[in-house]
């Protein structure tokens, strides 16, 4: 197989190989275990588990028994002789023992290698920026670390986590996630998490964000890290930046300086701080429904390209939907904080595996990765596992990989004459039992 179109599965297994994981464990001065459920096997099974519709521990064990991790098994006697139990106890204990720091290191390595594989020329990348919330199990430790929300009727039941993830604009590949409590005294904002997430990006990249991120603190943080921005502004902020009312379409050079409020919140900001850029104002929509769109950008791109770039921002909504619903991250069932974080990281790894297959399939058939359905490709991957595992040699394996990519490329979204529009509303669910107001 052409090295520029390397098999995504081989790349994942290479990053989680025995040598790489053992090296990371030794660097962290952690003990290297020789057993069936070694660190590399557990990480790989947790990724595969997230790709399955049910995603239970039993599906992870069954994947191991069918040979999904044969290349990662250690040299222990039980592994060599394939004396592996169908019970989930050993896998469950190994997941608990898995070092959280190791998960971070492996996932960071995966993101780096995927970025190199999908962007071999090293061109400038653009990232979509948005945040979301995830529901956690209502255990005492998680409720303390991630308090539930409160209102005039009392405290909610489920702990809630706030998360921010950068998604590469063309491929949808997710970068390292950052998260924190959404409520309580230690609650963190999406802007705070976004600033932390910027550290992993390559200087020169472009960040695309909505009005929630169209604030000076985000623009300043990106500017300090050598990143460029395209962010939407509120009408009031655009008016202040322009120095008066905006009545005509066009663009103008501006110097964005922080307000007194921005300066108070960002204590490390030097006196006289500012970010040079352009303010773009255009009318969007049709007929009487037209409205103003205000963008601030530090990217040296023509206005039409800046507008086209921001026009793709809505893709982050479907990216988050795929991450939360298709990879089943909307409610994390782990019952302690350490296991919850490991589940979150490996879920991002599973999501990126599907995105990598989509990108390679699109490249092979001269398509855009955004033209393919995430769920369709995930189903193709699940249906292809047994053929990949049973390939007798490298040539047969290569044929199966190409067969998988060809099948994935068939999952093109339909071209509708009129774009569908859905109201932001949900059907009411009737409950037979009364709502609970407190824990047992």
Annotate each predicted stretch with a short phrase:
Residues 56-80:
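DNA-recognition alpha helix
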Residues 70-71, 100-102:
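Short helix C-cap/helix-to-loop transition motifs enriched in small/turn-promoting residues
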Residues 1-59, 63, 95-98, 105-109, ...:
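Single, function-defining residue in the core of a domain
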Residues 74-98:
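Major-groove recognition helix of helix-turn-helix-like DNA-binding domains
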Residues 87, 128-129:
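Noncatalytic, basic helical substrate-engagement surface that gates or grips nucleic-acid strands
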